[in-house]
């Protein structure tokens, strides 16, 4: 058994760690609330844009934009949104596992793939994973702007426009609630057709000034908005996962302190008993 002094030092060390994890939990909780506000503010726009584009994809247009045409998938692109920092449980690991499984299924069909990682952890993973990394972004902070992502997204759009990509997906952690964050893969291109019940009534739009000018701008903005929504959802998921992880670490530290305190008390009791035995033995000898 370790000496009482060593155990006492260990207890002090664990208490210091507990203070750090408790502070990180509170910081993550505060950041999560702000991230939720940003996510809630951008979600209606992203969902409305997705709905409109879904109906456009179902419509009977004279001008068929390349983003509406389904072609054989020879090369697949992924925009993978992960975190810049760690200490957020299995958030990134679960996301990467989902991407790897999807890549494997495409690989079995003979398709090649390339990546556009967003977030330092995503960049680090995919540079060592294999496959081409066409563009990347990191250090976006807790309140990213759409302008921070446009350059990175355009690289993948240009590749699609040039026929270098036949499918484009965005991958991120969808925020469900504080305890649940789900990794999702959403198709960006070609445009997925709406699954809305209203699709049975088919919406046909009248375009001003003309379909080509409008769709060329609208469809690019659609892709950018979906990637941005994925980023803000992932940030909210990150802060929620970090808050939960730090709370678990704080609770575990408390349990460890209690266990060490018990060991310390036993060691101190044994030391006192030993000293008393030596005193009694010495007195008997005299």
Curated annotation (Swiss-Prot):
Keywords for this protein: ATP synthesis, Cell inner membrane, Cell membrane, CF(1), Hydrogen ion transport, Ion transport, Membrane, Transport
One Pfam family, short name: ATP-synt
Membrane topology of the entry: Peripheral membrane protein
A GO term, aspect molecular function: ATP binding
GO BP: any one term: proton motive force-driven plasma membrane ATP synthesis
Spans through the membrane: none
CC annotations in GO: plasma membrane; proton-transporting ATP synthase complex
UniProt function note: Produces ATP from ADP in the presence of a proton gradient across the membrane. The gamma chain is believed to be important in regulating ATPase activity and the flow of protons through the CF(0) complex.
Protein name: ATP synthase gamma chain
Biological source species: Shewanella sp. (strain MR-4)
